[in-house]
From Swiss-Prot:
Protein name per its UniProtKB record: Transcriptional activator DEMETER
Function: Transcriptional activator involved in gene imprinting. Catalyzes the release of 5-methylcytosine (5-meC) from DNA by a glycosylase/lyase mechanism. Allows the expression of the maternal copy of the imprinted MEA gene before fertilization, possibly by antagonizing or suppressing DNA methylation on target promoter. Probably acts by nicking the MEA promoter. Required for stable reproducible patterns of floral and vegetative development.
Region DEMETER, annotated ranges: 955-1054
Gene this chain is encoded by: DME
Molecular-function annotations in GO: 4 iron, 4 sulfur cluster binding; DNA binding; DNA demethylase activity; DNA N-glycosylase activity; DNA-(apurinic or apyrimidinic site) endonuclease activity; metal ion binding; SUMO binding
Family (UniProt): Belongs to the DNA glycosylase family. DEMETER subfamily.
Comp. bias regions, Basic residues: 844-855
Gene source species: Arabidopsis thaliana (Mouse-ear cress)
Length: 1987
């Protein structure tokens, strides 16, 4: 067969036919042919070659010491020692190398006494160190020589994989033979490669199937490694490269059955093992590597089990390790955890699971005995495809691993049979190397079946199970994923393993990866290969000196005195040379994360970043190379990657550069990972070696780049203090690292027995610690601490905590180690969090404890070692804490610890590529990936499971100034005085920002009013507790579900109603409606007492400071004088309430604006939402009617101080039954000359008479909040205007007189009584009051009485008021002359505004007015103003800003409020809607059942009950009404303290229930704000466009940006804006598939611009769908618009009909019979007046919406310029087509559009209709009437389709009597005088006017279908309904579904003239019910029926 050498390789490869078995250490290892590897890594090889100086990409430096694990798992010492050029190799062959070989051979031979096959630790023998390290010529092909990856790795050393090392196929000799510990590992032959003096295994032990594949695996349980995608073709020539040639067959050692079990662990191993067991090693050698070997049955793939399970070994500390990704091997069943503490168990493991046994038996026959095997010449056997696939990438050394494992396990002396060793080790599931774990449970080498948690993501999760193997056993070197454990069996060192931290303790050095040329002197003759973590073959191939092995010269702290090779335990990770094996640092220090782990510890399946138990977490191989096909990827790459760039993968917690590994760890790694490191660039390796040697005070002269194969011989006794880890990281498995490790191992020898014993303990410890450490590693990224040791020592490994005893030992060791480390870097190494758990197995307590307590003197070279030896990582697992300064963990950065301290980064391109592929920039560890299943693919590659991609979430671009103001508003920061100029600039900037947002709010409200109707504030009944429960129920679900849940709760726990309430329900109430939706009830208005810092020095024309100073305390007489007015109010209320007919209210509209606040000069700027203000000489003031009790409060605002007038006359009782319904004297109302001005007497007799200039005074338009919208005087005034204040006026118990106290400047409080004008349903007649004028607006819709009567009654009422007011003429006269400026008192109480917004207001020339209440007058009403000053805000917060009070302390707030205000009795308007006491006593399940339909019911039930329990506990009862009187900030803090309420929920309660200034941002608001461009976003990824966003910024961040800009708006504007926004989000701007083409805001919308640009540029123009302007004719039924100058927002028709009285013109004719006037057209609305069009148009006319095409064009152009890369000229082309008729985007066709909604024609029932007898009386403020839906003849309640004809009655002339017969029933009903119908109830009336959050759950035009009449329709005589107007009702499952896909006109029509209905309602139980099928049959049910 052709030689497998690559043409580029300058060294000889062994042809297959010549690849007989090589005799190594007395054992014959058959050459297992390897499937040719893909050339993926060729480039990398080339790079490596270049770096290494070998054009072939692989250097054949065969120095014995330099030998590193070959791809096959053989240590190619030469590869690592010095990758020499061909010339050097040749020279070495011819000269020194050969001599070195012979010397090393002699030394090794001299070691023949070493019997422990598991501990081939090389002792410092007389053998020449150089030869060991020296590069053997390829001719010699010396196994001992650096077993270069002769042909295996095409990629080069950098590509060298752990798998390759472990892959038995590629190993020319079995790992066991390498490990077998004769004094001389190799026998020098005169011909061919040296042969081992002794078999590494017990010849008497039966051969195992895995024997063939156990080459390198024997020490490690093989875990199917994740194949590296890069290394598909690497394996092909590996064996050839490794073994130069050997014409002689090497007798194949017979492997023990125990080894067979080891082979079971991997499919490849099993396959090869079986083949070898068949005696087909020769066949294997004959196999053509270029051909795919014959695949074994797919069953074998099962052997790629990710977990190594040790049965019977319970985890000592069950942990939830971050699970590693599981490798799923097709056809390979998961192995069951095996308990193999005993040999018997091991035996069971030998065969693996029963299935594996069957497979193996069927596949191959076991050789009779080992001897036979050894005698047999290797024959090439065809491997199964599976095997080929496995070794292809995943398990290069699997097949041989089994053999090597078995061989390794066996003592060279035969003292311990391999099977015995395996038994001792404990059966591992064989994930990595069953044999390894089985090698010797006693050795503890068997990794606990737990794979190291650190294992890379590629590693199967089963590694964790692997821990099971070792549980009972002390896993010597167990990487979580690595199941292979390489018990170094050679010598039975008697020192306790526990003390031994590393087998290979380089006395002076930590073993980084001192492979290759490093430490030529460190030939570990007896060294046993360190455990190669990951996919690597065992790092320690016995043939080469292993750093893992303690150098012979080095004395172990324990019985290390025997320089016998120490068996590597996980515990005995490579202890630093300083550390005696007995030293506490021993095993734990050795523990290294595989990624950054010492290579010696790398286990085959272990992913980089994984830790071997004994290893200290360095760079976790796992994290390093999760994606590598073999799970190990290139060991050196992985290690190097992890080592050199541990920081590359932030997620890999245990990524500690290999440099961090302890020397011993390094040595182990060197042994274990030497092969893997071989791939690393030689140059990096060389530099590493150099650093190491320098640290040791001698420099390795060999440079890979130069091709110097030999290093200068170093004194064997001298240890290299190489910063192996750092360098190793750089070298990434470079030879240098290997040599270092080797040199270190030379100095350390361990007794196999002791190591085994310790390993067992360690393994036990590791079983728990591995998982823990891995978890910890994941949780805490291993921090890189670069130790600047003079020697460039690698950073210390993370300290692992052991038992206290362990800690003591470790402390000692670490102390020594730390010394050196500390020299370079005094700063202590960062320790991983205690949570981290080291994989390092605890050293056996029995031996180690004593040792721990004892300080072990460092070896001779300890000082050197200390310099660079890291202390073991500190993990919760290992309790031992390193003592001394050396605590720096190897976690340190991968920087080399060499004197330069630089990290050599000479990586091949392949390595760089690999590292980049594995680069992870996330902040979190990829725990999910580690837990993920990895799919097995036919090519053998293991691909990590890709978790769901997280959808990108954009972030709001918030500037610092916004954050500052937000903090002030939230009370989180104090205002600091700054530069005045800067402050002024900021103030101007904020003014501009707020002006822009006022405009946006006004524009949005106006436009939405045109479409969605009037949604201004209208108070609902309900308590504060109702709203808190309501916000609980509204979280995370749509409003219709939330409202139904509350209704269900109310039905299940109905409130206890008093008889009076029941009586009230049946009393016909007066309907008072006003466009402002304001119904003020003085009884409900609490008094607010607060100090308001107001701008001072606010001079008003005509009011000088002197006049202000004249203010004095007023006497109480002023209040008494107001009594007459109070009486008149009561009389008027009685008269109005006596009316039995509903009527439209007379509205006294304030001059203030309806919409948002604006600047003082912006009155005409945004007229759409504001009423026109009339300024009359004096003051302009407007009064508006209020709630049913008709009491209203007037906000006195402006530059004039109110005066109190007195009068004592009684008001005549006037009959006002129908007065309010009249429309008389509108002109008079409008032309009132005088405004009612209320003054405040300075004292009983004196009145201040200073006249003031005109000012605008705004009447309150909200029940409890006075909106002072503009107190700028004639354009002058505060820098901010339209401040809203919310004085709350409570009627005193004895007197209904609101009292207000003002403190002006520093004067004493002034008292004035805010006058209350009795408001009636009709307009107040003009009242002539000298000196003042007030404009009163009234709008009345159709009434049942003629206008003349109305005018007469209005006149009569006017006289009444005139009389009333004339009685106090004198007072009023004085008042007119004593106008006072109360502007200062009108500041908003909330810091909504100026203060926070304008921090400089404190310095302004405004005078501070403090509003205080007299504590003695608790019963009297007071006005509290919302402060805007930052100072006041801070005062209000008090200590609340510091933090939330304990719940028990909140009652003090209630007491303060009630103490100041007095406990207010609850009235009918704030009563609870639910019996909360019953809920509190109910069980959680009962509450949960009531709200089950909503979802999340269990959690909410708990929260609701906890909330009720809390308020009862804190306050003694369920009552939070006191929050209405509490300061807004304190109320906010209190609500936030409730569990389950967030900022959005609290803001909802405050705005909608407490009527504070707040603006909640829910999902609808946030989404709209982003799409409209109101909130700036940080740049989005190029691939993501705005219209493709699925996630939006966090709501709180949106609120953080919006609130500082909206905080100056008044409460009414905020309410309407919020209500319109949430409705807009449900109707148009839905989360998915928004109705952009019908959206009236699309002209300004960024979302639409993005979608439009994308669609227009990528798709053909859609069909022209013009958004026709609304041309719906106005029905003749409606009255023409009434020209009321002050009325801006006439009510739509449905409101006019709310009274139940049809219009005069149409009350006699059905609407259907009147033809529409086609000729009538809406008045064309120009662009300028679009926003206020509806103010002056017919209230019944639907306004026209016109798209602002210019604005759209600008928005589109801006979007395209910013976000799209267009060619020159594309922009103009793209915008050419912009036209209103084409401004649409393609939309997906809606499915089941016919099922989204169902339209029904219904009749409108007046309130007095006979059908409503017995029904609840309609609520006064309910805009919707009762409706009647008529059934189609033959229709049933559940009929979803029109009834079908069921008889032929028509033909016969006779009708059937079948109720379901459509035809007959239609004829019958047509002839009958009755029809069937279902009642529809207005939602507000159905809920009796009480609902949480002010009823915003519902639409203003929402109805409920009466459930009873839905099931059994009522019979209605036709003559009852024939003349009623008709309406359209849309039925559906939700508001969103009803409006989906409708055009703008259709949506407009629904809101203006139609109604929506989404649920039924059962009146008796008051519970919600689903709609019956006849009303609406949803598509979801239709689908179910079909199925």
């Amino acid at each position: 067969m052709n030689s497998r050498a690559d043409p580029g390789d300058r060294y000889f490869r062994v042809p297959l036919e010549n690849q007989t078995q090589q005799e190594f250490m007395g054992s014959w290892i058959p050459f297992t042919p390897k499937k040719p590897r893909s050339s993926l890594m060729v480039d990398e090889r080339v790079i490596n070659q270049d770096l290494n100086g070998f054009p072939g990409g692989e250097f054949v430096d065969r120095g014995f010491c330099n030998t590193g694990v070959d791809h096959n798992g053989v240590f190619d010492h030469g590869a690592h020692q010095g990758v020499t050029n061909l010339s050097m190799m040749i020279n070495s062959l011819a000269g020194s190398h050969a001599q070195a070989w012979s010397n090393s051979e002699r030394d090794l031979l001299g070691r023949s006494e070493v019997t422990s096959p598991l501990a081939p630790v090389i002792r410092n023998t007389t053998g020449n160190v150089e030869p060991v390290n020296g590069n053997f010529t390829s001719d010699v092909g010396m196994v001992n020589g650096p077993f270069t990856q002769s042909g295996t790795s095409q990629a080069g050393y950098n590509e060298f994989e752990l798998d390759d090392l472990l892959n038995p196929d590629q190993m020319p000799f079995s790992f066991t033979s390498l490990l077998s510990g004769g004094d001389s590992l190799f026998k020098v032959r005169q011909y061919g490669p040296p042969a081992c003096n002794k078999p590494l295994y017990n010849l008497n032990s039966p051969i195992r199937r895995e024997a063939v594949g156990s080459v390198c695996e024997s020490s490690f349980q093989y875990v199917p490694s994740t194949p590296s995608l890069f290394r598909t073709g690497e394996k092909t020539g590996f064996l050839e490269q490794i073994v130069t040639t050997t014409g002689h067959e090497i007798p194949e050692p017979k492997s023990d059955k125990s080894m067979q079990s080891i082979m079971d662990s991997s499919a490849v191993n099993a396959t090869e093992a079986t083949e070898q067991n068949d005696g087909s090693r020769q066949d294997v050698l004959e196999f053509d590597l270029n051909k795919t070997p014959q695949q074994k049955p797919s069953k074998r793939k099962r052997k790629f089990m990710p977990k190594v399970v040790v049965e019977g070994k319970p985890k000592r500390k069950p942990r939830k390790p971050a699970e590693l990704p599981k490798v799923v091997v097709e056809g390979k069943p998961k192995r069951k955890p095996r308990k193999a503490a005993t040999q018997e168990k091991v035996k069971s493991k030998e065969t693996g699971s029963a299935k594996k046994k069957n497979l193996k038996e069927s596949a191959t026959k076991k050789p009779a005995n080992v001897g036979d095997m050894s005698n047999k010449s290797p024959e090439v056997t065809l491997k199964s495809c599976r095997k080929a696939l496995n070794f292809d990438l995943e398990n290069p050394g699997d097949a041989r691993q089994g053999d090597s494992e078995s061989e390794i396990v066996q003592n060279s002396s035969g003292a311990n049979s391999f099977s015995e060793i395996r038994d001792a080790i404990g059966g591992t599931n064989g994930s990595f190397l069953d044999s390894v774990s089985q090698i010797d449970k006693t050795n503890g080498l068997g990794a606990m079946n737990q794979p190291l948690e650190v294992s890379m993501g590629n590693q199967p999760d089963k590694l964790s199970t692997g821990a099971k193997l070792a549980r009972d056993q002390q896993p010597d070197l167990l990487t979580r994923n690595q199941q292979c454990q390489f018990p170094v069996a050679t010598q039975n060192t008697q020192f306790p393993m526990e003390n031994q931290q590393a087998w290979l303790q380089m006395k002076n050095q930590l073993i980084g990866f001192p492979f290759g040329n490093q430490q030529p002197r460190m030939t570990i003759r007896n060294q046993q290969p360190c455990l190669a973590m990951g996919n690597q073959q065992p790092m320690y191939l016995i043939g080469t000196p292993r750093p893992a092995l303690v150098s012979g010269n080095q004395q172990l702290g324990g019985p290390q005195g025997n320089k016998r090779p120490i068996f590597l335990n996980h515990q005995t990770c490579l202890p630093a040379g300083n550390q005696l094996y007995g030293s506490p640092t021993d095993m734990h220090q050795l523990v290294m994360s595989t990624g950054g782990q010492q290579h010696g510890l790398l286990i085959k399946n272990q992913q980089p970043g994984s830790l071997i138990r004994g290893q200290q977490p360095c760079v976790p191989l796992i994290d390093q190379q999760p994606a590598t096909p073999k799970g190990f990827t290139h060991l050196n790459q992985m290690v190097a990657t992890s080592m050199s760039s541990p920081g590359l993968r932030p997620h890999s917690q245990s990524q500690v550069p290999t440099t961090y590994l302890h020397v011993e760890s390094v040595s182990r790694i060197l042994n274990g990972t030497t092969g893997t490191c071989q791939r690393s660039r030689a140059p990096a390796y060389d530099s590493l070696q150099q650093d190491i040697h320098q640290g040791n005070k001698y420099i390795l002269s060999h440079e890979i780049s130069n091709g110097n194969g030999c290093k200068k011989a170093l004194p064997q006794n001298s240890s290299l203090p190489t910063p192996i880890m750092a360098k190793l990281e750089e070298a990434r498995g470079s030879k240098r690292q290997y040599h270092r490790a080797m040199g270190q191992t030379e100095k350390h020898d361990l007794n196999l027995a002791q190591q085994i014993a310790q390993s067992q303990d360690v393994e036990r410890h590791n079983s728990s610690t591995c998982v823990e450490y891995l978890d910890a590693a994941k949780k805490t990224k291993i921090q890189k601490v670069v130790q600047e040791n003079l020697h460039g020592m690698p950073p210390e490994v993370i300290e692992i905590e052991d038992d206290p005893t362990d800690g003591a030992r470790k402390g000692k060791n670490t102390a020594s180690i730390s010394k050196g480390a500390s020299k370079g870097n005094s700063s202590p190494v960062k320790k991983t969090a205690e949570k981290e758990k080291c994989i390092v197995p605890k050293t056996p307590a029995k031996k180690g404890r004593a040792g721990r307590k004892k300080s072990v003197p460092p070896p001779a070279h300890a000082s050197e070692i200390q310099l660079w030896q890291p202390t073991p990582p500190k993990t919760p697992l290992s309790r031992s804490k390193p003592k001394g300064k050396g605590r720096k963990s190897i976690q340190d950065s991968g920087k080399a610890r060499g004197p330069s301290g630089e990290l050599l980064c000479q990586d091949s391109i392949a390595e760089i590529i690999y590292r980049m592929q594995n680069l992870y920039l996330g902040d979190k560890e990829r725990e999910q990936e580690q837990n993920a299943m990895v799919l097995y693919k036919g090519d053998g590659a293991l691909v990590p499971y890709e978790s769901k991609k997280r959808k990108p979430r954009p972030k709001v671009d918030i500037d610092d100034e916004t954050t500052r103001i937000w903090n002030l508003l939230m009370g989180k920061g104090d205002e600091k005085e700054g530069d005045e100029e800067k402050d002024k600039k900021k103030e101007k900037w904020w003014e501009e920002e707020r002006r822009v947002f006022r405009g946006r709010a006004d524009s949005f409200i106006a436009r939405m009013h045109l479409v969605q109707g009037d949604r201004r504030f209208s108070p609902w009944k309900g308590s504060v507790v109702d709203s808190v429960i309501g916000v609980f129920l509204t979280q995370n679900v749509s409003d219709h579900l939330s409202s139904s849940a509350f209704m269900s709760l109310a039905a299940r726990f109905p409130p206890k109603l008093s008889s009076s309430r029941e009586d009230e329900r049946n009393v016909r109430s007066v309907v008072v409606e006003d466009p402002e939706g304001c119904i003020l009830n003085l009884n409900e208005i609490p008094s607010w007492q607060e100090k308001v810092q107001h701008p001072s020095d606010m001079e008003v024309s005509g009011v000088d400071s002197g006049s202000k100073e004249q203010l004095r305390d007023c006497s109480n007489s002023g209040i008494e004088r107001f009594n007459f007015l109070e009486k008149s109010i009561q009389n008027l209320e009685e008269e109005v309430l006596s009316s039995q007919d509903s009527f439209d209210p007379a509205i006294f509209q304030s001059c203030g604006r309806v919409g948002s606040c604006s600047c003082s000069k912006s009155d005409a700027e945004f007229p759409t939402t504001r009423c026109e203000t009339k300024t009359v000489s004096g003051t302009s003031q407007s009064v508006q009617t209020g709630s049913p009790n008709l009491s209203d409060e007037i906000c006195l605002q402006g530059n004039e101080r109110p005066h109190l007038y007195e009068g004592s006359g009684d008001v005549q009782k006037q009959e006002t039954t129908n007065v309010a319904q009249k429309k008389p004297d509108l002109e008079k109302t409008m032309n009132w000359k005088d405004s009612v001005c209320f003054g405040q007497p300075r004292n009983d007799t004196n009145w201040q008479t200073t006249p003031s200039s005109s000012y605008e005074q705004c009447a309150t338009r909200q029940p409890h909040v006075l909106d002072i919208e503009d107190f700028g005087m004639q354009g002058e005034g505060l820098g901010y205007s339209w401040m809203s204040i919310s004085p709350r006026v409570d009627r005193v118990k004895n007197k209904n007189v609101p009292r207000r106290f003002f403190r002006q400047g520093g004067s004493v409080p002034r008292e004035f009584t805010g006058q209350i004008i009795p408001s009636t349903p009709h307009e107040l007649p003009g009242m002539g009051l000298s000196g003042s004028s007030s404009a009163v607006q009234e709008h009345q819709d159709d009434t049942q009485h003629n206008q003349q009567d109305e005018m007469n009654k209005a006149s009569h009422l006017q006289k009444t008021f005139l009389d009333l007011l004339n009685s106090s003429e004198e007072c009023l006269t004085r008042q007119s002359s004593t106008k006072q400026n109360i502007t200062d008192g009108c500041l908003p109480r909330d810091r909504t505004a100026e203060d926070v917004v304008d921090p400089l207001s404190n310095n302004s020339s405004l005078q501070n007015i403090l509003v205080e209440s007299n504590s003695s007058n608790k019963e009297q009403t007071a006005v509290e103003y919302k402060e805007t000053n930052a100072t006041i805000l801070r005062e209000m917060k008090g200590t609340l800003a510091d933090g939330k009070k304990p719940t028990s302390q909140w009652d003090s707030l209630r007491k303060d409020v009630e103490g100041n205000e007095g406990r207010q009795e609850r009235n009918k308007n704030n009563m609870d809607s639910i019996d909360y006491e019953a809920i509190r006593r109910a069980s959680i399940s009962e509450i949960s059942e009531a709200i089950k339909e909503r979802g999340m019911n269990n959690m909410l039930a708990v929260r609701i009950k906890d909330f009720l329990e809390r308020i009862v506990k804190d306050h003694g009862g369920i009552d939070l009404e006191w929050l209405r009187e509490s300061p807004p900030d304190k109320a906010k803090d209190y609500l936030l303290s409730i569990r389950g309420l967030g900022l959005k929920s609290v803001e909802c309660v405050r705005l909608l229930t407490l009527h504070n200034l707040a603006f909640p941002v829910d999902t609808n608001v946030g989404r709209i704000a982003v799409r409209m461009g109101w909130v700036p976003l940080q740049p989005l990824p190029e691939s993501l466009q705005l219209h493709l966003l699925e996630l939006y910024p966090v709501l709180e961040s949106i609120q953080k940006f919006l609130w500082p800009r909206l905080c100056k708006l008044d409460q009414r504007t905020l309410y309407e804006l919020h209500y319109q926004l949430i409705t807009f989000g449900k109707v148009f701007c839905t989360k998915s598939r928004p109705n952009c083409n019908a959206c009236p805001m699309r002209g300004e919308c960024r979302h639409f611009a993005s979608a439009y640009a994308s669609a227009r540029l990528a798709l053909p123009a859609p069909e022209e769908r013009s958004l026709t302007s609304a041309t719906i004719p106005v029905p003749p039924e409606s009255y023409p618009p009434v020209a009321i100058p002050m009325i801006e927002l006439p009510l739509p028709l449905e409101k006019s009909l709310a009274s139940g009285a049809p219009s005069n013109r149409e009350n006699c004719e059905p609407i259907i019979e009147e033809p529409a006037s086609p000729g009538q057209e809406c008045t064309e609305i120009t662009e300028s007046d679009i926003e206020d069009a509806y103010y002056n148009e017919d209230p019944d006319e639907i306004p026209t919406i016109k798209l602002n095409i210019e604005q759209f064009g600008m928005t589109l152009r801006e979007h395209m310029e910013r976000n799209m890369e267009l060619q020159e000229g594309d922009m103009s082309k793209a915008l050419v087509a912009l036209h209103p008729t084409t401004t649409s985007i393609p939309t997906p066709k809606l499915k089941n559009i016919s099922r989204l909604r169902t339209e029904h024609q219904v009749y409108e029932l007046p309130d007095s209709h006979r059908l409503l007898d017995g029904m609840d009386k309609r609520e006064p403020d309910d805009p919707s009437p009762y409706l009647l839906a008529i059934w189609t003849p033959g229709e049933t309640a559940n009929s979803a389709q029109p009834p079908e004809q069921k008889c032929g009655g028509k033909a016969s002339g006779k009708m059937c009597f079948d109720e379901t017969c459509s035809e007959c029933n239609s004829l019958r009903e047509a002839n009958s005088q009755t029809v069937r119908g279902t009642l529809l109830i207005p939602c507000r009336t159905a809920m009796r006017g009480s609902f949480p959050l002010n009823g915003t759950y519902f639409q203003v035009n929402e109805l409920f279908a009466d459930h009873e009449s839905s099931l059994k329709p009522i019979d209605v005589p036709r003559d009852w309904i024939w003349d009623l107007p008709r309406r359209t009702v849309y039925f559906g499952t939700s508001v969103t579904s009803i409006f989906r896909g409708l055009s703008t006109e259709q949506i407009q029509f629904c809101f203006w003239k139609g109604f929506v209905c989404v649920r039924g309602f059962e009146q008796k139980t008051r519970a919600p019910r689903p709609l019956m099928a006849r009303l609406h049959f949803p598509a979801s049910k239709l689908k179910n029926n079909k199925t």
